[in-house]
Amino acid sequence: MNNIRKTHPLMKIVNSSFIDLPAPSNISSWWNFGSLLGICLIAQILTGLFLAMHYTSDTMTAFSSVTHICRDVNYGWLIRYLHANGASMFFICLFLHVGRGLYYGSYMYLETWNIGVLLLFAVMATAFMGYVLPWGQMSFWGATVITNLLSAIPYIGTNLVEWIWGGFSVDKATLTRFFAFHFILPFIVAALAGIHLLFLHETGSNNPSGLDSDTDKIPFHPYYTIKDILGALIMITALSSLVLFSPDLLGDPDNYIPANPLNTPPHIKPEWYFLFAYAILRSIPNKLGGVLALVLSIAILAVIPLLHTAKQRSMMFRPLSQCLFWILVADLFTLTWIGGQPVEHPFVVIGQLASVIYFMLILLIMPATSMIENQLLKW
């Protein structure tokens, strides 16, 4: 009798993706983040669905409905904080996943990488719109400031902003459409993730050495299923600890004040995972220039394959590039810190320096260093 796992049309797809998938024998824990992101996405969709059952997207009742969820709904507080901190977990995994791709040269799989960049943009858009929904002070002013950036686009800017707002300011129409988009986008993200996997399975996974691993493959199950379960348990433990011990650690206290268009908070800032991009935006005095830099800070990932000048794929055996990679990581931490600081001396100058270093490292210093390494290796 034929094995149903290998003959059934649906099971065949599952089998070739998660069971009999040939995987390199030497992939490290840095390859766990794909599955962790999948778990994050499923958790966010499920908790979000239950929140949407009790949430009302109306300016008069949005804040109250979130309070109602936390106070009156069975385990509503748990669902709400799992959703809010689940987003933070999602971005931690995303940043580590992208960092892994940069370090080990996974960006050489062009289609997979470009879909990944699209995914990053989609998840960032989803998270931004989700932050607006509780309709606290930071929700309202964050939405006002970030959507207002589009007015920097020449000629159509002002019309575009008013079209997105559905009026002359962030109001009921804005909140309603943001809720609609926030609900639908995760399903688009799930579809994109499917395409991401489809392209990945065309080539197979990269590995830490960056060398071809076709001669030494092992089945995904049981080796990497067990490894992924361990990673998932560690992540779930971290998320549970955050949710149960300090659920507001990563949030802004201002968001516990209902939105008030007549009162601007002293420091308008987004969630921690956007602070690096926000710092780059603020470090440019010109509005349009700032918006371009903001978009480019993420879009620059798409051109990284074109900037790969090294003869080796991975950074595993390239100590100079390794040093620069960790300088880039330190620079991103610096930008994140600056994004949360007020716009005053010395933070402005530090932010400008960190922004210049960020773009210089990626566009100039790292490709040049790779060429020097080629020379040193006489390749």
Curated annotation (Swiss-Prot):
The gene is MT-CYB. InterPro entries: Cyt_b/b6_C, Cyt_b/b6_C_sf, Cyt_b/b6_N, Cytb/b6-like_sf, Cytochrome_b, Cytochrome_b_C_euk/bac, Cytochrome_b_N_euk/bac, Di-haem_cyt_TM. A ubiquinone binds at H201. It is found in: Mitochondrion inner membrane. Binds 2 heme b groups non-covalently. This is Cytochrome b. It comes from Crocidura lasiura (Ussuri white-toothed shrew). The cytochrome bc1 complex contains 11 subunits: 3 respiratory subunits (MT-CYB, CYC1 and UQCRFS1), 2 core proteins (UQCRC1 and UQCRC2) and 6 low-molecular weight proteins (UQCRH/QCR6, UQCRB/QCR7, UQCRQ/QCR8, UQCR10/QCR9, UQCR11/QCR10 and a cleavage product of UQCRFS1). This cytochrome bc1 complex then forms a dimer. PANTHER family: CYTOCHROME B. Belongs to the cytochrome b family. The chain crosses the membrane at residues 33-53, 77-98, 113-133, 178-198, 226-246, 288-308, 320-340, 347-367. GO terms for biological process: mitochondrial electron transport, ubiquinol to cytochrome c.
